[in-house]
C-alpha cells in the first residue's frame, strides 16, 4: 500500500510539473524576454527559490502553514475558517506539497525557456510581422516549433526532478500524515535506514531508475519523430 501511494504521489508531482509548472514557466519566460522596468528584480524574485536550500524552503512553508499561528491560518481565521491544518490533513497535504514544489521549480524552467526564446532570430518574427501574422500564429508556428529541443530538455528535467524529490517532503511532512505524502525516495530512505530492509530499498531504487530511463527514451523518440 505504501509503495503504491509513493508512486502515485510522485506521478502527481510529475503531472503538476508537466501540466502546471511548464506552462507557467513558459509564460514567465515570454514576460522576461520583453524589455521593461524592473526586469532584473522580476528575474531575481522568480529564480530565488532555485538557489535557496529546499530544507530552508520547507521550514519557511511549515511556519506559513502552521495550524496554530501561521499567516495562512490567521488569514483563514479572519474569514471564519477554523481548525485548518493543511500539511496535517490527509486530503490537503499532497496538493500543498505539489504547489510548493511548483513554486520551487518554476524559476529554473523559466530561465531554460528564456534561453530558448533568446536563441530564435528576431528576423523571423520581423518577417512574420510584415506578413501580418498574429501573435498566436507566431507562438504556434514559430516559437514552439523552434523550441522543440528546449521543451524536450524541460520535460525530462521535470519528470526526473519529481522522482528525485526527497528533501522538500522530508522537511514539510516526513511523508505523513499517515503516508499521504510518501514518495519513492522517502520510502527508500525509511526502509534502508530505519527498518534495515535493504533489499526492498534497492528494488525501489531500481524501479525509479528504470522509470526515468524509460521516460527519457520515450521523450527522445517522440521529439525525434516530430
Language-model regions, residue ranges each:
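A structural signal for multi-pass alpha-helical bundles of membrane permease subunits
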Residues: 1-226
